[in-house]
């Protein structure tokens, strides 16, 4: 069996993000009070792409925030003695705003739970929605994405990697086969 398998190429990624952008606009009836927040790291890249798509469609550049959830994780003590902390930058008031959280992959649901908790510590949004490029299943919490690029059934012996130019000099999604469960 192959160790890596491509499940989405650059064009498929682009089309999925364009579709998600249209779905966000449709569900929210436009851009009023709408803001995007990308979850560090690859969620930020995908949020920027959605922001660009919406700007091309509506002619409006949505506010975009960057969220690091490191200290909100329920597995922080298991990660490392010195976890890598990225920046959080949300330069707009989130109170009474419709926030679309963006991430690359949803697996157990724990990352988005932490992101929601972090947002709630910053204010009281009118609504929080969740957009994700890949939903791989295996939820451990009662959380689902509002916008999904692709549902990809996986086993616990697989890892989904979303590759983006900004970090990987590539745009595609691959599944890596492991020898053990995660």
From Swiss-Prot:
Key word Glycosyltransferase present: yes
The keyword Cell membrane is assigned to this record: no
GO MF annotation terms: RNA binding; uracil phosphoribosyltransferase activity
Chemical reaction(s) catalysed: UMP + diphosphate = 5-phospho-alpha-D-ribose 1-diphosphate + uracil
Motif position, PRPP-binding: 99-111
Enzyme Commission number: 2.4.2.9
CDD domains, alphabetized: PRTases_typeI
Entry superkingdom: Bacteria
Record-stated family: Belongs to the purine/pyrimidine phosphoribosyltransferase family. PyrR subfamily.
Assembly and interaction partners: Homodimer and homohexamer; in equilibrium.
Role description: Regulates transcriptional attenuation of the pyrimidine nucleotide (pyr) operon by binding in a uridine-dependent manner to specific sites on pyr mRNA. This disrupts an antiterminator hairpin in the RNA and favors formation of a downstream transcription terminator, leading to a reduced expression of downstream genes. Also displays a weak uracil phosphoribosyltransferase activity which is not physiologically significant.
Protein name: Bifunctional protein PyrR
Species, as recorded: Caldicellulosiruptor saccharolyticus (strain ATCC 43494 / DSM 8903 / Tp8T 6331)
Source species taxonomy: Bacteria, Bacillati, Bacillota, Bacillota incertae sedis, Caldicellulosiruptorales
């Amino acid at each position: 069996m192959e160790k890596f398998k491509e499940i989405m190429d650059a064009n498929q990624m682009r089309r999925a993000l364009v579709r998600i952008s249209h779905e966000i606009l449709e569900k929210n009836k436009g851009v009023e009070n709408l803001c995007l927040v990308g979850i560090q790291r690859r969620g930020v890249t995908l949020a920027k792409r959605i922001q660009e798509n919406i700007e091309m469609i509506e002619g409006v550049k949505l506010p975009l925030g960057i969220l690091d959830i490191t200290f909100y994780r329920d597995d922080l003590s298991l990660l490392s003695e010195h976890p890598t902390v990225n920046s959080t930058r949300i330069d707009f008031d989130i109170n009474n705003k419709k926030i679309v959280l963006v991430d690359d992959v949803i697996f157990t649901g724990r990352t988005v739970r932490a992101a929601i908790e972090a947002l709630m510590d910053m204010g009281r949004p009118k609504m929080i929605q969740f957009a994700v490029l890949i939903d791989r299943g295996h939820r451990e919490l009662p959380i689902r994405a509002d916008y999904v690029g692709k549902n990809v059934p996986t086993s616990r012996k697989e890892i989904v990697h979303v590759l983006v130019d900004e970090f990987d000099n590539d745009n595609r999604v691959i599944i890596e086969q492991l020898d053990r469960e995660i």
